[in-house]
């Protein structure tokens, strides 16, 4: 059973520094639910999370920005502290939103990648890992192919590709079909 997060100002709802002063307490409460409840429950179930055997003590957003391309996503770097380790682990965690009015056939494949349910007024949807979003992944490929630099937080996120990238991906890598990874693996 997933938690429901109520958004009042889109992505900005999660970040105290992004909302007007009268809404900062609401944003702080929502941010704390995300970092203290939702992310500690979500991260251990992801195949890429290296701290599966540890107990998460805390999670914080180290850097983030709303990225607008064909839609809006949040590009975030989260810092995770585990009880047994003195050094934090950093992870890139892009997030996307999908809405119930988009149809069940669009939402069903996203459930395994979902962090929480979200609500904006009467509209319900999902907050999920953007790597499960085909447009997001295709945008990433396009930026790698073009060696693009985009602003992120107070700095830049630079995409680059090797020579072999173009031989594998072709001239239009953003047109490649996207395959979602299985949730678990054996290494």
Predicted feature residues:
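Phosphate/pyrophosphate-binding loops and the adjoining catalytic core of nucleotide-dependent enzymes
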Residues: 2-187
